């Protein structure tokens, strides 16, 4: 970010549109969830987009978050003893979080790219990823989610139905509505009468 110059023209318009998608209320909810999920040791960021970005930038908080959603002994992300200071180590830590989130079930379309967070290019995408992760945690309901379940929407789950052979045979005798109905007005019993007589 230090080596990036200011954006002009169309680039600035695009960047300002991206920045308008960032939701401050959602940031508050995400911070509350991360603190509830990981414990108060993660601290709290300064309010605003930049404070949120600085808090998550080294990848440690994100790694602790995704690790807290797994049972003990099967933590997917290795967290170093001291927070990484080198740029490539921080980006690698973020990439490990993204891989673990994908393994947890977050779809690729909900994932942010490493530069979206590291260079604060699209913090709204970071929020989308965290919301998707929270929704999955609430949906799985495996006891590892901490916080208010109403913070995230529960995803729809499959409701598989099993039919016996006799039920399937009975279904063959029913006329489906796609085939039309056998009740109501029809041409049954109509008589046509005589043809029209044309005499010149």
UniProtKB/Swiss-Prot annotation:
InterPro entries: Calponin-like (IPR050606), Calponin_repeat (IPR000557), CH_dom (IPR001715), CH_dom_sf (IPR036872), SM22_calponin (IPR003096). Gizzard, uterus, intestine, esophagus, aorta, and trace amounts in brain, liver and heart. The modification N-acetylalanine is found at residue 2. Calponin-like repeats lie at residues 175-199. SUPFAM superfamilies: Calponin-homology domain, CH-domain. Its main location: cytoplasm. Pfam families: Calponin, CH. One of its GO terms (cellular component) is cytoplasm. It is found in: Cytoplasm. The keyword Repeat does not apply. Keywords: Acetylation, Cytoplasm, Muscle protein. Residues 24-137 form the Calponin-homology (CH) domain. The keyword Acetylation applies. PROSITE patterns: CALPONIN_1, CALPONIN_2, CH. Monomer. Belongs to the calponin family. Actin cross-linking/gelling protein. This is Transgelin. The gene is TAGLN.
